[in-house]
């Protein structure tokens, strides 16, 4: 696709994080304290100091993006950063968001696990919809409800909590939970539940080395508070969730969908994605 790739060692995040002025860190920390719905400090995995480290990491990534003129990015994180520094959840969420503690900004696509095909798919979605793009694991199917729970460790932009460009609409619905045993370095996991609405889902993937694009429609759904909580606890409560009903059968989806990651924006973008695939000279497979 004629995309140049810059490989930047993630030790640069640690180096640059140390140079962030404490005054900037404290200002961001105060903004999060005032605006996030609830921060669940536990004195171990999530402390004010660890949250401030995540803020420093965010400024470090902003510096890398600026210095290398990156249009979009990804962070490997596991296991070096997540074992020994902090998780990148806060960084990834607010890069993908249309705002942070410094004010409004254009969403910068940042894929967790340095998933390059995720970043490519998300960048296409961003140019089409001009909104943040969901990055999620295809985690669990609730057969009794006919819904998928799309979950990721903290990558979901907080935009999806309220589907608004105004942080005052979204952030009261967001919780910062302590990271679990997967990530011993700790930090905050950015928890919320995707706002209901019709959505389009897609993923660039490969078959025998050749790219193709999976495309499907569906909707994000919610239930009453008790049921939402019970469902989220069946996977990982601390992580962000998107309860999703696809417009295709489980069998059709499972037969050919070729990734554990999936991406989405609100609205119907099937025709536009098919046109993009045609321009790129790749197959578009529309489910349903």
Which residues does each predicted region cover?
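Solvent-exposed, charged interface segments at domain starts and junctions
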Residues: 1-13, 153-157, 167-168, 173, ...
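Conserved, well-structured core segments that form the ligand-binding/active-site neighborhood
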Residues: 1-131
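Short secondary-structure junctions
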Residues: 5, 133-135, 284-286
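Short, surface-exposed linear patches
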Residues: 27-30, 94-98, 156-159, 227, ...
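Short, glycine-/Ser/Thr-/acidic-enriched flexible segments
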Residues: 78-80, 140, 165, 269-270
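Long, charge-rich C-terminal accessory regions
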Residues: 110-116, 120-227
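Extended hydrophobic packing segments that form well-structured cores
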Residues: 178-288
């Amino acid at each position: 696709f004629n995309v140049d790739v810059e490989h930047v060692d993630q030790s640069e995040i640690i180096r640059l994080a140390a140079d962030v002025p404490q005054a900037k860190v404290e200002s961001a920390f105060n903004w999060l304290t005032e605006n996030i719905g609830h921060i669940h400090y536990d004195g171990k995995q999530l402390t004010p100091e660890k949250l401030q480290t995540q803020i420093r990491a965010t400024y470090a990534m902003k510096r890398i993006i600026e210095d290398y003129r990156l249009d979009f990015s990804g962070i490997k994180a596991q296991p070096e950063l997540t074992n020994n520094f902090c998780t990148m959840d806060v960084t990834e969420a607010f890069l993908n968001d249309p705002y942070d503690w410094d004010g409004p900004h254009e969403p910068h696509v940042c894929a967790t696990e340095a998933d390059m095909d995720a970043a490519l798919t998300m960048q296409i979605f961003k140019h089409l919809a001009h909104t943040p793009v969901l990055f999620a694991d295809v985690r669990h199917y609730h057969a009794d409800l006919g819904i998928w729970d799309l979950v990721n460790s903290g990558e979901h932009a907080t935009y999806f909590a309220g589907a608004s460009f105004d942080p005052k609409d979204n952030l009261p619905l967001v919780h910062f939970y302590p990271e679990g045993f997967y990530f011993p370095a700790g930090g905050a996991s950015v928890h919320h539940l995707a706002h209901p609405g019709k959505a389009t889902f897609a993923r660039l993937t490969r078959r025998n080395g050749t790219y193709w694009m999976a495309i499907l429609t569906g909707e994000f759904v919610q239930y009453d508070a008790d049921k939402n909580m019970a469902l989220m606890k069946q996977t990982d409560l601390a992580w962000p969730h998107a309860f999703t009903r696809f417009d295709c059968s489980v069998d059709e989806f499972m037969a050919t969908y070729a990734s554990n990651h999936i991406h989405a924006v609100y609205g119907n973008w099937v025709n536009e994605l098919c046109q993009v695939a045609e321009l790129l000279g790749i197959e578009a497979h529309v489910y349903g």
